[in-house]
């Protein structure tokens, strides 16, 4: 899964988080983006706020979608590894290396699933800030 900072690595959770951090840059800088691109009332004639807000909204949605796909892809990949390790453990329940690896993968899977919750909070925060500043200039389409 390609990401702005490189390839999303599902095997190493630290790298996975680092790439997500880079992918969340647009959300982290939403206030700055709005302050520098959406005019206040006194400067409203100099910039097309409707177009600016529309472009920013589209960028946000694209970033949210790509992160969601990346996280879900890694969850799917890690779930498959967990399933395979469970099968191996069922065949050989005394193999400590399989049991240890299974625990490690299960922990990683739980951490990746928790990233979906983090993603929801980040997205909600960004959209709240966006709506506070752009609601008079641009109304995004309703998400089905």
Swiss-Prot record:
Coiled-coil regions, chain positions = 82-120
Give the highest taxon in the source lineage: Eukaryota
Answer whether the UniProt record assigns the keyword Coiled coil to this protein: yes
A Gene Ontology term for the protein's cellular component: mitochondrial intermembrane space
- Cite the entry's keywords alphabetically: Coiled coil
The record's similarity note reads: Belongs to the MIX23 family.
Q: Which gene encodes it?
A: mix23
Q: What is this protein called?
A: Protein MIX23
Organism of origin is Danio rerio (Zebrafish)
């Amino acid at each position: 899964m390609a990401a702005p900072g490189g390839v999303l690595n599902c095997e190493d959770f630290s790298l996975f988080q680092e790439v997500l951090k880079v992918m969340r840059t647009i959300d982290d800088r939403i206030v700055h983006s709005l302050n520098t691109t959406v005019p206040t009332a006194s400067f409203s004639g100099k910039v097309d706020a409707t177009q600016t807000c529309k472009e920013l909204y589209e960028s946000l949605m694209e970033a949210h979608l790509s992160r969601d796909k990346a996280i879900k892809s890694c969850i799917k990949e890690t779930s498959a590894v967990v399933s395979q390790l469970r099968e191996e453990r069922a065949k050989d329940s005394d193999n400590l290396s399989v049991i240890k690896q299974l625990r490690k993968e299960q922990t990683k899977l739980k951490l990746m699933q928790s990233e979906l919750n983090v993603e929801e909070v980040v997205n909600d925060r960004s959209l709240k800030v966006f709506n506070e500043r752009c609601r008079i200039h641009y109304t995004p389409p309703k998400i089905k």
